[in-house]
Design a protein with these regions (language model features):
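A short acidic, Gly/Pro-enriched loop at the edge of an enzyme's catalytic core
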Residues: 123-135
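Conserved class I S-adenosyl-L-methionine
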Residues: 2-64, 77-81, 101, 165-191
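A short glycine-rich, Lys/Arg-flanked "PGG" loop and its adjoining helix->strand segment in the class I
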Residues: 148-160
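Conserved Class I S-adenosyl-L-methionine
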Residues: 3, 42, 48-49, 75-77, ...
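Class I SAM-dependent methyltransferase SAM/SAH-binding core
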Residues: 67-124
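Short glycine-centered segments of the SAM/dcSAM-binding site in methyltransferase folds
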Residues: 67, 161-163
Length: 274
């Protein structure tokens, strides 16, 4: 499989009480504009040049004749340039909870053959039992109101030797760092912590018998503060920061730069469950 080194994901979790509220999620992902801002900062400043999306995809191990379902496909960028992989699939279904995001995925992958597009809620997947070899759900499980119901639906979809690939964030990465810079009270026990690298294995083991955790080593080295200001203002769920004027955000970031660089820790990874 050929990978684009700038591929990235960022459905950045935000410590909002609405993170797993259906309408809040629909609003956050109704258009691709804010998501693209968050994707861009990773593409531009990540120290790991493989790209998080490429790293995730390298663990799918899609073989000839496999059926694949992605839940929460976002803009579809994960599949751009992957025609060879798509051709291997006997069936590839890309789905999202948001109509607007699914429209963007169709636009991104216009001209690609062999892809089905569906609006799907993970809690009520409209397929029969044992239909897929691989089910994918990246950076979205913390949005699911009834996570265990969603995971049971995924398990129902999988063939006997199928696997579930799901990427998520850790509790000590970008958001914790940004909140610390601005002295915002950290709500680590809220809905944003419902599926993390720290607690995800336990949640998955309630449904799956074999769970593996993989960690992605990375950070941001930001040299243009304006890009970080844009990033912060794209965080729909963090009104305390998003509503601050740019002129109040900028000096806080500049104060924490060293040698013209703002070092931002990242904590991302994925689980593979069977």
């Amino acid at each position: 499989m050929e990978f684009n080194p700038t591929d990235n994901l960022d459905h950045t979790p935000q410590n909002s009480s609405g993170i797993n509220d259906r309408e809040a999620v629909k609003k956050q992902y109704s258009t691709a504009e804010k998501l693209n801002i968050r994707i861009s900062i990773h593409s531009k400043y990540s120290t790991n040049k493989q790209g998080f999306g490429n790293w995730i995809a390298s663990h799918y191990d899609i073989r000839d004749g496999m059926s694949v379902l992605e839940l929460g496909c976002g803009t579809g960028e994960m599949w751009a340039g992957k025609q060879e992989t798509i051709r291997r699939c006997s069936r590839l279904v890309l789905s999202d909870f948001s109509d607007g995001m699914l429209d963007k995925a169709k636009e991104t992958l216009r001209g690609y053959d062999g892809i089905e597009y569906r609006v799907i809620d993970i809690q009520d997947i409209p397929f029969g039992d044992c239909e897929f070899d691989i089910v994918i759900a990246n950076m979205m499980l913390y949005h699911v109101p009834d996570l265990q119901k969603g995971l049971r639906e995924v398990r129902r979809m999988l063939k006997e030797n199928g696997k579930f690939c799901c990427a998520t964030f850790g509790e000590h990465g970008m958001m914790e760092y940004i909140e610390g810079l601005f002295g915002i009270g950290q709500n680590r026990g809220g809905a944003g912590s419902s599926f993390t690298l720290q607690n995800g294995e336990e949640k998955l083991r309630a449904v799956f018998s074999d769970v593996q955790r993989l960690l992605y080593e990375d950070a941001l080295e930001v040299t243009n503060v304006e890009d970080m200001v844009d990033y912060i203002r794209s965080l729909t769920g963090m009104s305390e920061l998003r509503n601050l004027p740019r002129d109040e955000i900028r000096p806080v970031l500049e104060k924490n730069m060293t040698g013209g660089v703002l070092h931002v820790p990242k904590e991302y990874g994925m689980f593979i469950a069977r």
